[in-house]
């Protein structure tokens, strides 16, 4: 079969049959055209064109419409006869060109005008208007044959009389397409169903509930995942600045690595944490997830972890520790100096003055003033490094033999503070005022911004010698203004008493002797 189909003899037979069919069709068309020319009388005005003549226009329009319907019915019958008899065209553009060529030769040969009836029989269809309906088309009763050329489609469609009349201005109402549709199509609604948006939304909600909400967007859409990571980065920065934990968009097993601001941001996937076993841990974890302002604690804090102190309290404690250390250091130096240093003043009348192992009143006052000076300015006190003299204050008694009874010495020493308190009440008041001002200045004044000059021992000794010679200068030095710096006052008083202990003046001994005598009496 394949050889017979593809053989050259079969192709030749097909070509010969095609040529014969074309020649036979052209011969038939020429014979029909010649017979029509012989039967056609002289051209007269057609009845269809009587509309534009004088007379009653309404009757002429009705006649024209009836003639249009008659011509359509006649054409449909003739078309059916042509198809039944086998005179239907094969539907190729070449045959259409042959038909037009035959008509052109007939027109040129005879030189006569063809009537509309001949054009309808020779070319069955009028020139088409693609906007016309199928009801007015000539193909309603014709064949269902598929057209393959534009000329055939144009021939099969006729003009619509209603469209022509509405175009010419006839008709009082607006021309609507619904007027041609029967009323039975509008009595009942359409049974077609579109998209039910409520059902669609319900299915979407059901799918969201079945899937994991944390993994739904981040795993499906790359763009949403990128936006979530970016949002987490900004939330991480916000939580670092505001010191409040913030819930993230990304799943719990993924987090934004923002430990250091210079680190490159990256996403690390961690292993899932084990679920807490005890109800207390589960309740704590649930509360930490629900509340944004509570920091989740995976493990309890260690017992040795103490709460952080306030910065001001920490500074005060550090200052007090330093003061205690410096006090202990100064006390050790004073104890060593009591046994090492000798008395620089020679005794009167060749008698040696005994040294008492107990501190006297002057040494106690000097020690307290030195402690206050270390509290105010420990660095300046260490720089000056004043030497604490030993307690060598002599107590002149009428008996040339010094008593070595310790009980008597204790009684005498205990009586000295009382005597000193009675004789110098104003000095104690000024001392406590200075101490209170020193405490206030420790926390209110800026010690680093003010410069304090260290006082040398030689300068103090020179001032003391001048004050011995000039009592007015000593009185002015003792009555200093209240707005001077407290550290200078404390140090000057301590240096004065040190010099008094080294070089005791003559008029003070009778005063003490009289006080002691009055106390014994």
UniProtKB/Swiss-Prot annotation:
GO cellular component: COP9 signalosome; cytoplasm; cytosol; endoplasmic reticulum membrane; TCR signalosome
Chief subcellular location: cytoplasm
Any Pfam family: KRAP_IP3R_bind
Polar residues: bias regions: 331-341
Compositional bias annotation for Acidic residues: 485-498
GO biological process: COP9 signalosome assembly; positive regulation of T cell differentiation in thymus; positive regulation of T cell receptor signaling pathway; protein localization; T cell differentiation in thymus; TCR signalosome assembly
InterPro entries in the cross-refs: ITPR-bd, TESPA1-like
Source domain of life: Eukaryota
Post-translational modification: May be phosphorylated in response to store-operated Ca(+2) entry.
Primary role: Required for the development and maturation of T-cells, its function being essential for the late stages of thymocyte development. Plays a role in T-cell antigen receptor (TCR)-mediated activation of the ERK and NFAT signaling pathways, possibly by serving as a scaffolding protein that promotes the assembly of the LAT signalosome in thymocytes. May play a role in the regulation of inositol 1,4,5-trisphosphate receptor-mediated Ca(2+) release and mitochondrial Ca(2+) uptake via the mitochondria-associated endoplasmic reticulum membrane (MAM) compartment.
Record-given protein name: Protein TESPA1
Organism: Homo sapiens
Gene for this chain: TESPA1
